[in-house]
Amino acid sequence: MTHADVVEGVRAAIAAYTLALDDGRTDDVVATFAPDGVSEMPGMGRLEGHDALRAAYARWTPRRPQRHVVANTLLTEWTDDDARAISDVVFLLQGKDGWSVQMVGRYDDTLRRDGKTWKFARRSLTPIE
């Protein structure tokens, strides 16, 4: 597996998560995680495993249009089966007066290859104040 293959797979996992999250597709969000995957976000605590992830993300389906804009993804470590990446994220929410920034933060991701796709083993969000 080449560096480019890993980068492409990691970016695809990040995009799949983001699109599913913004569209409110809970099962598709959960599918981006390994079965024992962990999500850590302020206000959510530590969620481990598909059942805990599904229960939490089902409560956070969007009630109005939203977008998580992810940029500057950098692969920091990788092997053929594991990878670490960091990305910046801006969370936008549409209100009656248009779109507004709700949060700026950084994802710190550990991913594991599952066949041809990459899954989150751990996804941590740190807001930037």
Where are these regions (language model features)?
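Short, low-complexity N-terminal intrinsically disordered segments enriched in polar/charged residues
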Residues: M1-D27, A31-P35
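A solvent-exposed, acidic/Ser-Thr-rich amphipathic alpha-helical stretch
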Residues: T26-V90
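Beta-strand elements of well-folded, non-transmembrane domains
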Residues: V89-G95, P127
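Short beta-strand edge/turn micro-motifs at domain boundaries
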Residues: D82-R84, R106-E129
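Short, solvent-exposed loop/turn segments at secondary-structure boundaries
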Residues: K96-S100
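Short, surface-exposed coil-to-beta transition loops
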Residues: H68-V70, Q102-Y107
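Rossmann-fold NAD(P)H-dependent dehydrogenase/reductase core
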Residues: G9, E48, A52, A56, ...
